């Protein structure tokens, strides 16, 4: 079940359900998500000013509202409703998380007897996993790819932390992507050690294909690829670059990605006087990522805390040596890397 499907997903081995297409039972009639909904307060105000939706969407929502004949909504009522999920982070993220749980419960009810295990990935889906488990009685496995402590340090979002904790305690088994993550789950979330198993991430080492892109420069290229956020340590990459350039001037540094620290990093590069040696590509995906690795001489992952970090494996797949943070899960499986 995904919040937003595009319709071109490979479904040869997986049945993809678009949550936006599901009519879900909403209300306290055993939906499986009742207590989750009780924790959320939605106040609907009639207004001509509606943020972030198009006029067409507004007309559609208004038509549904008029047809329902409702002036107020109560959790003691039950009716079927279809939700539109953005599939993006936004101001109404927590509302989408709660509604996603309602949809997951409905799907679990509709597919009764057709599945054996519920597998929920990261906190956005944990309430959905809990709701599906309550409806179906099937075992719940939650997959912890990153904790709130990885993303935010000690300044955790208490709402996110609470959802993570609830999901892991409700689960029959917790999968951690590294022993580093496993220890955080035990010590910070109070999850019993015997409940958690470590399964490291991996990449498929397929034969490299396609023409190697022309570099256009003779300088060595050092690459950072990932979200430009606190967790990924982009500022350490910049400071290290400044030190390298004092000793070896014919090096270029590439920061491939986007994130909330991007403007801060750009300003820091300018203040250090190394802008002529720095390149910002923006967010890369698919084949562009592969090309970036092909153009690189060294890949650096300076993460402050990295639950796993699959990009060094992707770099090594392109025969690029890597320098990685010791505070990473991938450091547990890489013997041939500078740490």
Model-derived regions: residue spans:
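A conserved catalytic-core segment of Leloir-type glycosyltransferases
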Residues: 2-108
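Short hydrophobic beta-strand element within catalytic cores of glycosyltransferases
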Residues: 321-324
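Carbohydrate-associated surface elements
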Residues: 180, 202
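Nucleotide-activated donor-binding/catalytic signature segment of Leloir-type glycosyltransferases, i.e.
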Residues: 264-284
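Conserved donor-binding/catalytic core segment of Leloir-type glycosyltransferases
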Residues: 175, 215-241, 254
């Amino acid at each position: 079940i995904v919040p937003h499907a595009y319709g071109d997903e490979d479904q040869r081995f997986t049945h993809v359900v678009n949550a936006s297409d599901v009519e879900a039972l909403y209300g306290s009639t055993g939906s499986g998500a009742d207590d989750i909904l009780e924790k959320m307060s939605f106040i609907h105000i009639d207004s001509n000013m509606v943020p972030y939706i198009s006029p067409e969407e507004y007309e559609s929502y208004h038509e549904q509202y008029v047809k329902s004949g409702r002036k107020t909504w109560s959790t003691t009522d039950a009716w079927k409703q279809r939700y539109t999920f953005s599939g993006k982070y936004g101001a109404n993220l927590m509302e989408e998380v709660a509604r996603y749980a309602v949809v997951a419960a409905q799907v679990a009810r509709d597919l009764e007897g057709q599945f054996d295990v519920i597998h929920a990935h990261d906190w956005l889906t944990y309430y959905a996993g809990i709701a599906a488990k309550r409806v179906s009685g099937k075992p719940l496995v939650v997959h912890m790819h990153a904790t709130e402590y990885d993303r935010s340090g000690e300044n955790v979002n208490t709402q996110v932390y609470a959802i993570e904790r609830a999901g892991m305690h409700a689960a029959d088994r917790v999968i951690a992507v590294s022993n580093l993550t496993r220890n955080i789950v035990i010590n910070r979330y109070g999850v019993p050690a015997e409940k958690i198993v470590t399964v490291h991430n991996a990449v498929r080492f397929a034969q490299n294909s396609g023409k190697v892109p022309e570099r256009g420069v003779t300088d060595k290229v050092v690459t950072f690829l990932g979200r430009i956020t606190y967790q990924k340590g982009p500022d350490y990459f910049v400071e290290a670059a400044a030190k390298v350039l004092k000793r070896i001037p014919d090096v270029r540094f590439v920061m491939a990605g986007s994130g909330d620290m991007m403007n801060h990093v750009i300003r820091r590069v300018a203040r250090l006087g190394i802008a002529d040696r720095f390149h910002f590509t923006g967010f890369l995906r698919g084949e562009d990522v592969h090309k970036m690795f092909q153009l690189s001489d060294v890949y650096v992952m300076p993460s402050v805390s990295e639950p796993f970090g699959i990009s060094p494996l992707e770099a090594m797949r392109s025969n690029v040596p890597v320098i990685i943070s010791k505070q990473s899960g991938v450091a547990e499986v890489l013997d041939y890397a500078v740490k």
